[in-house]
Amino acid sequence: MALAAPLHELAEQAAALGTRIAIETMPFSAISTVPMGAEIVTAAAHPAAGLLVDAWHVFRAGTSLDQLRTALRPEMIFGVELDDAAPEVIGTLFEDTVDRRLFCGEGVFDLIGLVQVLRDLGFDGPWGVEILSTSYRVLPVDQALKQAADTALTVL
């Protein structure tokens, strides 16, 4: 587990400064799934090392809710980002993640199931909405914020 030692070292530094380090997995990166990230966090063996769980990254990596349930412990989840997407990747995975995300409930991700799994595990940390989308970038900020909050509440 080559990344565990550097993560442990970063977590030590973060803890000394009163903060923590979270890995966010990406299906097109060296740490491509949440279960893979959980293995690295477990091997790093430091309470200041954890994961940021992003719905887009979970579902586009093909990770099942059962795999999440098996891989995660509540103390390793530092935050969750909610978002949705179309049934098929639009463009490359990178283009899909930075330009084509949808508000919660507007796509095909099982966000209610994801939220339930994380709650069943005991996660009680912060929930956020991460909508990276060319179509939403043109919205007035107050409208985008309201739509993000309103749609997120439908799955929380």
Please annotate each region the language model reported.
Residues 34-38, 42, 57-124, 133, ...:
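Gly/Pro-rich active-site loop or hairpin
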